[in-house]
Amino acid sequence: MFLATAMGVSAQTQQVTVVELHPAPGQFVNTLPAATAETTHEEVCEAATESLADEELIHLGTYGGYITVQFDHPVQNKKGSDFRILGNGFYAASDPVYGSETIGGSFEPGIVYVGVGDDVNTCKWYELAGSEYYTSEIHDFSITYHKPTAESGDHKQPFSTFDNYIKWEATWTAKDGTKRDSTGYHMKTSFHKQTYWPLWEEGETLTFKGGKLPNNAIEQSGKGSYWVLYRYAKDAYGYADASLNKDQYSTFDIDWAVDEQGNHVDLAEINYIKVVTGIFQYCGWLGETSTEVAGFVDLHLVPGYDDDPIIIPVKQRPTGVASVRADGKDDVRYYDLTGRRVVNPTRGIYISNGKKIMIK
């Protein structure tokens, strides 16, 4: 032990350090972890580090909010999945449409990025291309949230204490190349009375840019009371808080890394992991869809893992247009060129399984 210490060598552990925590507004901001008006960014990162050590939840807020962590060692890129991210996703006990076969419940997918470099401020970031990357993900979504000027106000929506609580403005490019923009408000619910604005952030606005995943919630009661948040498919992969912690789809392969043009990048190891809330969605009384994380695991430190690693089949980048018949009986999901799912496709061009499909 003396020799190892003298040489500057230390054992690798599963302990992570939170180096950045910048949630977007959300119902559990300032509570997971706790923060006050006097809390600094450094202090909230320390609190988040302690929470993750105990596998307690960290709330990232609505779209764009993120956390960045670092192990006490680089994570190696070896065969199969390289690390696991814990969340709080679960399946619905009673799905009125799909019953026990449901792939829905509470799944709030976060996009995962990996960083290479010695400094979080200057490292090179790469997105891990999940199952929706080449089909329905929007890659240039930008949103600005405005700090609320009051914590209560006019409210007519159910379970609201302030309908026009936090103003937001968003821009993006649709799949057909059309430039889009939208403006609206997040309401404040009666269930969480603290401010939803992160108290350690300076300034009057927060802006987030990056990939955005398609909405995944369906209100199944017809009365606004029962929201089900679905996985994109049984074999959907590549997103945090989007599957059960124990299954293979909560693991991530560094080989999924792509550059800004969606091209594969070979990485020997990574130094940082960033998780970003990937959906911009509001579900009535349930509130915003917000990714939560509860831990990170370097799989290569798990005894015996490398002898039988998890290998997840991936969707390839579309290379052309295939042709199928409109009366096909195959159980395949189709999306239009804006990323919206089409249940009964007619003649035209769609995206399916990562490829452009022409239905005649």
Language-model segments: residues:
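Bacterial Sec-dependent N-terminal signal peptides
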Residues: 1-13
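A domain-level signal for the mature, folded cores of soluble proteins
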Residues: 12-108, 130-317
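Beta-strand signatures of extracellular beta-sandwich domains
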Residues: 111-113, 333
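Short loop/turn segments immediately following beta-strands, especially the blade-tip
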Residues: 115-120
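Tryptophan-centered short beta-strand motifs
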Residues: 121-128
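Residue-level detector of functionally pivotal "anchor" positions at catalytic/ligand-binding pockets or at interdomain
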Residues: 312-338
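C-terminal tail/sorting-segment detector
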Residues: 349-360
